[in-house]
Amino acid sequence: MDRGVPVDRFYIEHFLSSHAALIRGATLEVSENRYTKKFGGDRVSKALTLHVKNNADVIGNLVTGEGLSDIHVDCFIMTQTLPFIYESGKALKNAISLLNPGGFLLLTVPGITPISRFDMANWGQYWSFTDRSLRRLIEEIKDAKIVDLRTYGNVKTSMAFLLGAAQHELKPGDFEVFDPAYQLVIGAAVQRVASN
């Protein structure tokens, strides 16, 4: 039964909204371009979608780089994708390589999360993250500079998410407390810097 918009989407959208000015020029988004349209608006000159299998503008593999050699964008929106890629470090490195110098990767990952049955059956689900693990993955990429890395969540929203509650079942104030002990969503804005 679909109860409505999941709790974690509130935080994902809050993060993207706070970095909306970075969603500009040529953009790439995993699976669909919902957030590019919602937060990029007129700043976006070209909106591409990426998928490993089908129904996308770009069919490519973030781990191997296959199908991605001709892609260069100003912004790459990658929400809740890394948990489903076993070699997440390679995928993150290739994601950064798709950016034009000065471009931005807007990345979100789950911290506290249940298993997604659909994704587990189709790709596998391998990871949950913390702010420290995500920071370390990014810092291992020489051309990547973390501009912002923040956590979202608290005990109430984490419990609600695990129980399958929807956003409308919580009060607006429930989302205002960010407790680093309950990292439901971690967001990072990462800039590609020129190589030395």
Which sequence ranges carry the predicted segments?
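A generic secondary-structure signal
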Residues: 15-19, 65, 94, 137
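Short, flexible hinge/linker loops that cap or flank conserved catalytic cores
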Residues: 21, 41, 69, 180-182
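Surface-exposed cleft-lining segments at the edges of enzyme active sites
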Residues: 2-3, 79-82, 120-121
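Conserved SAM-binding loop
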Residues: 26-116, 190
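A structural signal for well-ordered alpha-helical segments within the folded catalytic domains
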Residues: 10, 14, 71, 131-132, ...
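S-adenosyl-L-methionine-dependent methyltransferase catalytic module, highlighting the catalytic core
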Residues: 89-90, 94-96, 100-196
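Class I SAM-dependent methyltransferase Rossmann-like catalytic core
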Residues: 1-21
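Short gly/ser/thr-rich secondary-structure transition/capping motifs
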Residues: 8-11, 57-61, 171
